From Swiss-Prot:
Species the sequence originates in: Acanthamoeba polyphaga mimivirus
Taxonomy, superkingdom: Viruses
Family annotation (PANTHER family): ANKYRIN REPEAT PROTEIN, GH09064P
SUPFAM superfamilies per record: Ankyrin repeat
Protein name: Putative ankyrin repeat protein L72
Annotated ANK repeat ranges: 88-117, 119-146, 171-200, 202-231, 233-261, 298-324, 325-357
SMART domains in alphabetical order: ANK
Amino acid sequence: MNNIRPKYYAFYNKISEGYYNPLYRKGLNKDTIYEIMVEDGFPTEKNVSFVSIENIFQQINFGSHIAEVFVPGYVKTSYNETTLKHYADMCIIGDIMNFYDINTIRYLIDNGANIKNCGNLLCQASQLGCIDIVKLLVKTSEKEFSGMDDLTRSNKLISTQEIFTDFKNNDHNVCILIAIVYKHIDVVKYFISIGEILSVKDDSLYFKLACDTGCLNIIKYLLEIGFDIESNNNYCLMISTINGRNDIVEYIKSRGVNPNNHVKKCIQIITNHNDDLKSSDIFLMTKFIKTTGVNSNILYQLLLIACEYGYYSMTMYLIKAGIKPTNSCLKIACKNNKFNIVKLITKYPKTRLDINVDNNYCMKQAIFHKNKDMVDYLTNFKYV
């Protein structure tokens, strides 16, 4: 193999035993590495693509497996500086390897893989719970970032990630957020062990995500390091009740929280109304109240409040839950100029509300508020 250039690698995703996407074929390959099965056909990209070992950790997307790629010296190649990928019409494919195996990652590092910008890989390893890979990347980065502690180096690596953009630049450790979402407590504990300090403020995203995903072990751990089980208006109790996570609800109760008392508190909060409250918070409380099994009279009172303040999602939720809107709901919505609610409760199937109720009260309110759209809507209204 005198005429063969240095090794490159191609990524593959394992679909089933012996089948990979793109198609893996050991040996000589000509425009076949990216054959993808679509509707039993095999469309082919123009060229084979692969990445150098130096840039293998800098990719935005990785595969579950990799294979060595050898390119004969007489084969012409091209290079994309944005994707860091090389292209050729022909190459020789070697053995396939599990990319997320610690031995594979160690081998790549030992043979020249650059980890300075491996934020995407660090995040992916956190997502998959590959704690050994996470530790290896942070440890090995000592050569790139000398004089820094483990936490500072890990944050340097994380800052280069491009795949979890929703979590980026929000003063949170992205890898911990990802590990919480995918329920990998070992990854969470590791970053805490190297010095990461999580904010335990009332609206902490860390604790909220743990409750959203319903991982009791992570919830317990976060409480051990200082988080409050009743934070953010008992968010954990409410979302766990809504999601049917009885194990978490029972655990919360064991810590002295009374769900019935919180139901009463939520009803009072919604009834008293506060302009500082977000509609999403009110919607969450409404779902919690409904899930606990309160009687329909209470839910109807909540529907009236939703119509008064224009809470569209809350109104829709209560109607779908079986609380039928009445002419009183319609009048309240018109009085408060909530055209979105007027349209919802008059067009919703089977409501059949009287838009002319109380001597054209709704039209008078629309005119009073100078709401031309509502005037036109009521003028041209036809029952479904």
